[in-house]
Amino acid sequence: MYSTAVIDIDENMTLPSPHRRISGHFEGTDVDFNFYLPPETRWQGRFFSYVYPDQNSTAIDRRIGFALDSGAYLIQVSGTSGYRADAAAAKFSWSILANYYRSVPEHVYGYIYGGSGGSYMTIGAMENTAGVWDGAVPIVVATPVSIPLNHAVRNLASAVLRNKSSHIIESIRSGDVEKAMPNLSETEASVFMEATLSGVPIEAWEHFSGLASSRMLKVLLSSVKNLDPSYADDYWSKPGYLGTDNSTLSDVLHSNFANVTAIIQEVIAISDDDDFAFNITLEGVPENIVNFDGLEFTLLGMGCSSKIGALTGTWNPSTKSIMVTKDNPDILLSNLIQDRRIRVDNGWFIAMHTYHRHQIPSRPGFYGFDQFIGPDGAPVYPQRAVQAAAEVAKGACGGCIYGGNITGKMIIVDNLLDSDAFPWHADWYKSQVQRTLGSRFDDNFRLWYNERADHFFEPVAENLKDFIVDYTGMYEHAMRSLCAWVEDGIQPPASTSYQVQNSQVIPSGEADERHGIQPIVELSMNSSLIGNIQRGTEVNFIMRAVAPVGAGKIVAVEWDFLGGKTFESMPFGEPNEIVDLVVPFVYDIAGTYLCVVKITAQREGNSSSQFARVNNLGRIQVVVR
């Protein structure tokens, strides 16, 4: 499929730094690629492949700049399932290097990295290829139990706990999660524990609105419908499913269930839009429809006894209208006429909230699902014939079995506040590699966990800067350590030391015990003032930041005393592995504040470098009377 590559553009670029960009495509496919080549004086005989299932082939400046600064050329291929297009692009790149470099080594070192859906591709590449990539950095690892099950349990818990969100958030910010427990009913506490045992990080609930987002669950609906089309019908009709259960949990979840038949009141053709064909207004939709999520619209035949098909479009609950897209089948568009009936329901969406209960993996070791196995060893709930998450993973990774038989060195970067890719899933994959490699494990594998980091690659939103850090520098650090490991035999820092309790990954406390690459920060205040801080009193904040052995030096310390998410840099001397500071501050206004210090370590101890900077946050709540 990817046998013939064609170069379309070959040009010199100046930004983010001088390089050569080669753009091309594979003949007979819709897959294209870009190579970003550093000048010969900067190339060190290696390349990086960045992968993600639905990316385009144009790399962002930060990614290009990092590769160039690391002595590598960057390959970015438009997104596909699996790794084959990326492998073909890598092989093609070798064939043209002599056109750009006078000296090309016999072996060009290759490294592949990608996160979330890209971790499927990265692991697939390392289990199913040899001789293309020498190492890999999978980031925020997805496994054969991740999608869509993580989102199902997360949305179940957030739907039940929504009315207690403020109690949960406050207890986490105060550093005492147990404070929230007395405020939860028996049902709420049970669902909270179900989510915890499934792997939702407890402290991630501080960003409750993020966990409550149903966007991904709705995106993943179509995959489950294709793989397990009878699930929703079974949910609402068969014993053992919440849809037929008479319980408080059923009452809470199903209070958000909608199933009505509406009438098309008006149809307005849209002639000046590339995406939408009609705007249709519905009659007979309840006034509170704005409160219902995951709605689907099915056009019914005459007499409502048959279905013509599902409509796609954009729903506007305030006007009770649908902007119908042009990509709907002609039979649907031609039947959008006044007085025709449309069924409005979210039965599939509601049913998805407990899908994880019916998906106990057939493979051993996925301990987050043990809660759904009874004392007799049998599943508590009916199990589906298809294991949807395993099928999703199989397609995304290019058919790999997640057996751990990696063909090169690997450093996994995983985040402890990740509610999309649960932290314990990386621990599970580590066990697969360890079992398969045996005595070769320590020479080929690392797992680095990072606290105060979430899932997405985008810059941290302003309202979350006191909660999480940007972790781009963490996997940049991993990529550089991987290069040194493969090419020069320099051992990277040891894997993070941690324990798993109730599916929660808990790292060791001290830097010399925790290992990994993230600096640890301890923040406290003078004990004599705790609980008795008066306005105008000077508070001394005591901070210690420690970089793990071999992980670089602390190069920056920034403070936010008032919880305004605005950090001010504070000089502390030369970069060092350990930084101790006592910083005074006066609070003039009574209130509750979250004082936050952000520390940054850089792999080479270079305070001026923008790359391979690893951050962490120290936080303490301050009550001023």
Which residues make up each language-model segment?
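C-terminal His-loop and adjacent cap/lid subdomain of alpha/beta-hydrolase
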Residues: 1-625
